[in-house]
Amino acid sequence: MDCISIDELHHRIKRLRPDDLILDVRTLEEFLAGHIHGAQNTPHEEVVSIADTLRRYETVYVHCKMGGRAKMAAQELEGTGLSNVVCVGDGGIERWIEMGWVLKK
């Protein structure tokens, strides 16, 4: 599984293509409080149920609050046979907020 930092995701944001997806695996309440623009929310406990729909994306960037849930979700998705998953760790949305980067509410 490929892993990148949230800083690297921030760097890549401007180059994301329509066939890339940012998957926020926090709870709906956390997501609604603030999320990365364009991100889709599916709580980490439910990601396996959307695995088939994720196959159409070139890259699926999985992130959460700090990185723990993202790692679990990415591993579960890889267990379904997906090879397009990138785990985003090293701070997650907490680091995003700390850096003052824009969130959508």
Where do the PLM segments sit?
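Rhodanese-like catalytic fold shared by cysteine-dependent sulfurtransferases
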Residues: M1-L21, T27-T59, G68-K105
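Short, surface-exposed ligand- or partner-binding patches at beta-edge/loop junctions that are enriched
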Residues: H63-C64
